[in-house]
């Protein structure tokens, strides 16, 4: 139907952008960005326990038992999600200064990978490469007696960790440690062991952010003081300064030269400008990590009734793609996939 006659003559406008916003069908026809379940990578926490444990700071998330993990990955598959990333909650008794449990081929993550590949062979399995879940110091690298996070010594251990994960069946290795040169070293180590087919999704621009708090609670992986040993109180000597943008381009160029297959920006929501810059600079796929703090804020506001959770989540995920991300790591993955299916 034609709109009611205007009370005064129409303005003489050559182009009216609202013409293409008039109906849902028209808006869908000219929509520039599309969101689908295939865009999501679903982060999952796993522990040695026989039952699943709710994570207080991340409502709706669990530390999954191996049986629970298998069931949850099956649910994700049924919703159209095709990639999960695994993070271990390691028992304190297995944590050491060098994090050697990280390359134990009988450890939690290798067993979880093998189990998932047996039951859900089509699911893409991404893993995390860093020492912090395995370190009694809570850092991504080895901490010297002087309180310095050692780069090259750490990279040697990360290579062993990556190979152990690949041997278990991992499809994508995700170095989140932010040590210099680790992408090239891991690529070389994988190739030498016959894992040329295993990809690297590098945490290229990982910022020393305040948005990681709930994640560290989930894994008990925050830096911690040790008797008689100075421990850096944060990760600012290896993760990026939130004030820097050009530095992200340098990191991206290095990762691409060293053989990264996919590059990631973490956190995502407060760093949409970085996602956009990397998209302009590189032809590699770009991933954005919708991190635990971002997730927790949405959940808390939704619980109070202050926001429409469904609308806010889908808008947030769409914004990552609009900024230039091809893939999105998000704890909202299953909810978002279900909402997209509902239309």
Give the residues covered by each predicted segment.
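Short, Lys/Arg-enriched N-terminal segments with co-localized hydrophobic residues
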Residues: 1-10
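Alpha/beta enzyme core
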Residues: 23, 35-41, 47-343
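N-terminal amphipathic/basic leader segments beginning at the initiator methionine
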Residues: 10-31
């Amino acid at each position: 139907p034609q709109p009611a006659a205007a009370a005064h003559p129409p303005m003489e406008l050559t182009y009216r952008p609202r013409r293409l916003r008039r109906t849902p069908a028209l808006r869908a026809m000219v929509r520039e960005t599309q969101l689908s379940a295939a865009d999501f990578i679903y982060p999952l926490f796993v522990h040695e326990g026989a039952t699943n444990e709710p994570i207080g700071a991340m409502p709706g998330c669990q530390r999954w038992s191996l049986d629970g993990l298998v069931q949850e990955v099956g649910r994700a598959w049924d919703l159209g999600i095709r990639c999960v990333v695994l993070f271990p909650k390691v028992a304190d008794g297995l944590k050491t200064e060098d994090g050697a449990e990280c390359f134990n081929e009988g450890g939690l993550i290798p067993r979880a990978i093998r189990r998932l590949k047996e039951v859900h062979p089509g699911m893409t399995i991404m893993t995390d490469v860093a020492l912090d879940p395995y370190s009694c110091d809570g850092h991504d690298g080895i901490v010297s007696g002087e309180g310095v996070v050692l780069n090259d010594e750490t990279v040697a251990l990360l290579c062993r960790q990556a190979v152990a994960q690949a041997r278990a069946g991992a499809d994508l290795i995700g170095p989140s440690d932010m040590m210099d040169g680790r992408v090239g070293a891991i690529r070389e180590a994988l190739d030498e062991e016959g894992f040329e087919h295993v990809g690297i999704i590098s945490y290229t621009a990982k910022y020393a952010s305040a948005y990681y708090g709930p994640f560290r609670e989930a894994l008990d992986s925050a830096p911690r003081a040790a008797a008689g040993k100075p421990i850096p109180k944060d990760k600012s000597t290896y993760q990026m300064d939130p004030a820097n943008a050009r530095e992200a381009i340098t990191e991206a160029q290095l990762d691409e030269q060293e053989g990264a297959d996919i590059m990631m920006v973490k956190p995502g929501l407060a760093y949409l400008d970085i996602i956009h810059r990397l998209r302009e600079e590189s032809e590699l796929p770009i991933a954005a990590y919708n991190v635990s703090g971002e997730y927790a804020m949405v959940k808390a506001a939704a619980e109070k009734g202050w926001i429409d959770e469904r609308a806010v989540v889908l808008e947030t995920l769409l914004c990552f793609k609009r900024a230039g991300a091809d893939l999105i790591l998000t704890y909202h993955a299953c909810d978002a996939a279900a909402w997209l299916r509902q239309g």
